[in-house]
């Protein structure tokens, strides 16, 4: 991702495309967040997943970025990072895997997302985390896939 302009381009590409049918990441929350240079690795992972999911489809996909994203998720998990940003990144990776027919990884990642949401206290019909997000950013609701 490197430079701030790249992150802005990735964010714009994501919100212009994927976000239209999977409104899971709050643009307002990202815009109100910390300056990018002060952000944590979980936010960097989310931007990496946003870049991955918005990459143009090619006849023979280059899986380098995908492998880097999977490795970064594993590193964050082993470091004990628990955050909504990381869950959102994992969901985007699962969508990428399903879209590119990367099996059984797609099922494994989906299962990991379900278990990770349990750690965050997000369950079917449980909107506690949403209420916390809404209180932080006003009436803007951030959707979550459960």
What are these regions (language model features)?
Residues 4-146:
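Acidic, Ser/Thr-rich, low-complexity intrinsically disordered regions in fungal proteins
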């Amino acid at each position: 991702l490197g430079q701030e302009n790249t992150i802005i381009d990735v964010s714009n590409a994501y919100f212009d495309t994927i976000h239209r049918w999977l409104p899971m990441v709050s643009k307002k929350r990202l815009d109100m967040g910390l300056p990018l240079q002060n952000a944590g690795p979980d936010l960097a992972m989310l931007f990496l997943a946003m870049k991955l999911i918005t990459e143009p489809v090619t006849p023979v996909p280059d899986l380098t970025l995908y492998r880097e994203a999977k490795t970064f998720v594993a590193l964050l998990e082993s470091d004990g990072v628990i955050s909504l940003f990381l869950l959102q990144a994992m969901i985007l990776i699962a969508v990428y895997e399903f879209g590119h027919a990367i099996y059984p990884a797609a099922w494994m990642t989906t299962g990991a997302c379900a278990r990770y949401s349990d750690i965050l206290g997000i369950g079917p019909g449980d909107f506690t985390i949403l209420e916390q997000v809404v209180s932080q950013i006003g009436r803007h609701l951030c959707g979550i896939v459960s």
